[in-house]
């Protein structure tokens, strides 16, 4: 399975912060925002990843993440010339995806919860159809909303409905079989001129192959699209890390625990950061 992080867009809701830098490069407490969705793919066991950015930000992402070897993975890059919809990621990434299934995660979504790794690997193991991750919200009219039956099969999906049929929002994490590329090519732009991910998901629903994985009690799904939510996400990460003495979205740790980095490589990466808490945390891992 391949992984795609969509890290384009203009981030206008975060102006003036994002006038000179991509939203997905902003810090969320102690690490860049893009570390969080990248960690999701790595926890799912995905090692071949495409990062799609706005043209003006591509070099900055390459400078931060390189070819992925520091994290035991392979990272490629592509650009989205203009924000023409989430589903466009599959058209841009067609050659990268090839004959594989694919997971798409949005570059500004943060997930945290017990047994999340197991949940991700189960979704990644599906060979047919699509899986969306749903989260219960108090204001579903602001989101894509999915309705599902007792077997967790989607029965309806709508984008920002005035009268939601459920209070389960579709998060920015999606697993698809290889048909996603051809389905995306068949989409027509919506009224706002975008290739909508909800329309792509509806094609799987009409095919009877759209599954829903709920993120229930004990899970956190954080959006970082506003000044307030960005601050809240940073506070959440800080609180969890301080209480548990564990790091969220520590890419080096995930790679090391997955057997993708040796002890020697982890120490090599940690030493230049030994004066801050992040580097000290990595060095402590080697002593346990």
UniProtKB/Swiss-Prot annotation:
Principal EC category: transferase
Disulfide bonds: none
Comment on bound cofactor: Binds 1 Mg(2+) ion per subunit.
One record GO biological process: biosynthetic process
UniProt-listed InterPro entries: G1P_thy_trans_s (IPR005907), NTP_transferase_dom (IPR005835), Nucleotide-diphossugar_trans (IPR029044)
Keyword field: Magnesium, Metal-binding, Nucleotidyltransferase, Transferase
SUPFAM superfamilies associated with the record: Nucleotide-diphospho-sugar transferases (SSF53448)
Reaction equations catalysed: dTTP + alpha-D-glucose 1-phosphate + H(+) = dTDP-alpha-D-glucose + diphosphate
Family from the record: Belongs to the glucose-1-phosphate thymidylyltransferase family.
Quaternary organization: Homotetramer.
Function: Catalyzes the formation of dTDP-glucose, from dTTP and glucose 1-phosphate, as well as its pyrophosphorolysis.
The protein's name in its UniProt record: Glucose-1-phosphate thymidylyltransferase
Gene responsible for this protein: rmlA1
